[in-house]
Amino acid sequence: MMWENWTIVSEFVLVSFSALSTELQALLFLLFLTIYLVTLMGNVLIILVTIADSALQSPMYFFLRNLSFLEIGFNLVIVPKMLGTLIIQDTTISFLGCATQMYFFFFFGAAECCLLATMAYDRYVAICDPLHYPVIMGHISCAQLAAASWFSGFSVATVQTTWIFSFPFCGPNRVNHFFCDSPPVIALVCADTSVFELEALTATVLFILFPFLLILGSYVRILSTIFRMPSAEGKHQAFSTCSAHLLVVSLFYSTAILTYFRPQSSASSESKKLLSLSSTVVTPMLNPIIYSSRNKEVKAALKRLIHRTLGSQKL
């Protein structure tokens, strides 16, 4: 066979941003480190305030808390290794390390897609069927919906990662990305991957496009209900409860669809890296900022938390 004399790959090299100058990489390190810390602090703050404040115990904030946990996980999987490639040129990653990173990328990504759809359903019930909302979105139902979102991430991550790393890697080991995403890793496989690529497309449609269509359908019904409300105040109040989620969904899915539904030949590897940066680094930072700035209840809860903290320090 043509691969008999090739060396079996035991580690990979992340190309990351090695084409840039050392000075520019240092600037990117400072930028991404700042974004990373802001992301962690912002999402931890959302988690704390939705747990501690009695006014934020509704299903909407339960799901928001789950979203913040997912965003923290997403960042921990991708950003620390990327920072290492920028500041100390630590571009190598073991075979197991690459598989682990890819597994959790799939896990958090699929779980977030499903959770965003669940959050849209919560807003749909709250606005379109408010009388039955307490029954439909009870504690047990919310826990089941959240668990289903997390479990969806487990299933797709297990199937995809196990399949990819069962292929032989016996040639080049340079992954043209800043993390172990599936397309650049699959490009290094020395076997026929056509069946896997068909399955991967099916999984992408199922876990990205299908939840997006559910969200779209929910918001069509929500907007239709809002426009039929008689009072301007009622319209404003109803829309304000879902505007933050709608903005988060727009950011998340615009980059996801551009990244995974464009033909492989239509975009350069550098533009794909920029899109991936937007979805894996920038969006997780913006989510807590969006919710804390556009949601009146979250803003009020943050003010109460700050006042309590400052008051306890004075004592």
UniProtKB/Swiss-Prot annotation:
Keyword Protein biosynthesis (UniProt): no
Q: Which GO terms describe its molecular function?
A: G protein-coupled receptor activity; olfactory receptor activity
Q: Which residues lie on this side of the membrane: Cytoplasmic?
A: 48-55, 122-140, 219-238, 294-315
Task: Note the SS bond partners.
Answer: C98-C190
Compartments where located: Cell membrane
Q: One of this protein's GO BP terms?
A: detection of chemical stimulus involved in sensory perception of smell
Q: Which InterPro entries match?
A: GPCR_Rhodpsn, GPCR_Rhodpsn_7TM, Olfact_rcpt
Q: Which GO terms describe its cellular component?
A: plasma membrane
Membrane topology per record:
Multi-pass membrane protein
Tissue specificity note = Expressed in the tongue.
Keywords, in A-Z order: Cell membrane, Disulfide bond, G-protein coupled receptor, Glycoprotein, Membrane, Olfaction, Receptor, Sensory transduction, Transducer, Transmembrane, Transmembrane helix
Q: What is its main location?
A: membrane
- Which residue stretches are annotated as topological domain Extracellular? 1-26, 77-100, 162-198, 260-272
Glycosylated residue positions: N5
Q: Please describe what this protein does.
A: Odorant receptor (Potential). May be involved in taste perception.
Task: Name the family.
Answer: Belongs to the G-protein coupled receptor 1 family.
- This protein's name: Olfactory receptor 10A4
**What organism does this protein naturally occur in?**
Homo sapiens
The encoding gene is OR10A4
